[in-house]
């Protein structure tokens, strides 16, 4: 087994809960999901986000099969989607239940002709290399405050995760508290989790998804 294979195996063991002993006294994942759903409901009520029409809940039925219940009441058996048995206290959910995902703007919405010199009034444009090299200080592209006001859908803040979506796909970077507010460019996706307690787990599982899809 080479280094890459070992790394992939460790990642898979971690995702399946086989890397370290599981503590039965740990708070079950269902409690955390309830907190996330409550936070999402609050944001919807305050008009900060829109209700997800594809929202669903995954649960295990009395027959031990897994089902997904959608917002319209439809229930579907998803046993064929379950890749492995979960440890006690773990539960399945869709990634979109954990946060808000936003791809960068189309090419014509953000071009080099719109960039301005760096100043105390300019706004940072986050690039793919920020995600790949895990450093918010990299990059030399900025936009004016007027342009920034037109691109509010692509704004990123500290505690967001940026994901590279072109070339080197799937590199993730959690923006620290001292990272400046900016916007993402075309090669990035912004992820804003409802609960920051799951940042490490989200990044781990996202890496696992990319691994199994290769």
Question: What does each of the following model-derived ranges do?
Answer:
Residues 6-81:
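Extended, domain-scale alpha-helical bundle/helix-rich regions
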Residues 95-102, 131-138, 152, 158, ...:
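Basic, amphipathic alpha-helical recognition segments used for DNA target recognition
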Residues 167-171:
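Short, charged beta-turn/beta-strand-edge "cap" motif at the junction between a beta-strand
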